[in-house]
């Protein structure tokens, strides 16, 4: 099990860096592509869902290196028919699974997955960690997403420990809003330790703010305790 994030949603360099995989096709779901007009073969990239041969996929990427905004690209061995592939739930783009400590390709038959997120990052996950090792030689930021998530979920548990000690019956909605607002303010892209006293002040201030004026954005509570 392994996952790395690469700071691009163009796949030409990513595909070139990957080692040779067993013969496979690409199941592409929840697709949103920036470059869907003005070149031969572009029409298919305006669809939300595709099943392409590896040859066709790589030819188009090599020719155009189009930017993907969203999409899940699942490499599935050629021995499986389309009917067999569709027996399982199709992979989704907007899912919290990429915040987990352990990340696998969503489709049970996939050996590797590319996930384009909001036009800026690609998450590459595989059932064998060795498949991802060459990606660390790419230019730009390449990060071990599982390692980053373990740190993040530890930080979220610190926030929740303080909140639940003070407010044992806190609602999931408020708990989720508090943990993310505090995490973004104190931990996101910052180094150094945050003291318990300072964190407690921030957590309780955000809790009071949420009670007075709850966040209007719907959310599903992300449980960092489930990631231990």
Question: Where in this protein do the model-derived segments appear?
Answer:
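A broadly conserved detector of short glycine/acidic/proline-rich loop/turn motifs that flank catalytic sites
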Residues: 32, 77-79, 128
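Extended non-catalytic scaffold regions that mediate assembly and binding
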Residues: 173-176, 217-228
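Acidic, low-complexity, intrinsically disordered interaction modules
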Residues: 173-215
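Ordered hydrophobic segments in well-structured contexts
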Residues: 3, 25-29, 70-75, 113-114, ...
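Acidic, proline/glycine-rich low-complexity IDRs
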Residues: 103-161, 165, 218-224
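N-terminal interaction modules that seed assembly of large macromolecular complexes
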Residues: 2-5, 9-60, 182-183, 187
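Surface-exposed, low-hydrophobicity interaction/linker segments
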Residues: 40-115
């Amino acid at each position: 099990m392994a996952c790395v994030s690469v700071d691009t949603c163009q796949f030409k360099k990513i595909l070139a860096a990957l080692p040779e995989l067993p013969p496979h096709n690409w199941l592409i779901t929840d697709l949103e592509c920036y470059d869907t007009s003005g070149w031969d073969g572009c029409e298919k990239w305006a669809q939300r869902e595709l099943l392409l041969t590896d040859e066709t996929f790589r030819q188009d990427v090599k020719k155009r290196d189009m930017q993907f905004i969203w999409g899940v690209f699942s490499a599935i061995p050629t021995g499986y028919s389309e009917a067999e592939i569709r027996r399982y739930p199709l992979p989704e783009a907007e899912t919290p699974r990429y915040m987990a400590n352990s990340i696998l390709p969503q489709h049970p038959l996939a050996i590797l997955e590319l996930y384009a997120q909001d036009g800026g990052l690609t998450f590459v996950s595989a059932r064998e960690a060795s498949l991802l090792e060459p990606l660390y030689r790419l230019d730009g930021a390449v990060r071990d997403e599982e390692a980053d998530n373990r740190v993040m979920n530890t930080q979220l548990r610190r926030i929740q420990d303080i909140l639940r000690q003070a407010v044992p019956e806190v609602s999931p909605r408020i708990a989720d809003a508090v943990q993310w607002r505090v995490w973004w303010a104190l931990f996101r892209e910052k180094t150094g330790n945050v003291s318990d006293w300072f964190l407690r002040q921030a957590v309780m201030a955000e809790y009071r703010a949420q009670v007075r004026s709850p966040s209007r954005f719907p959310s599903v509570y992300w449980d960092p305790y489930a990631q231990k």
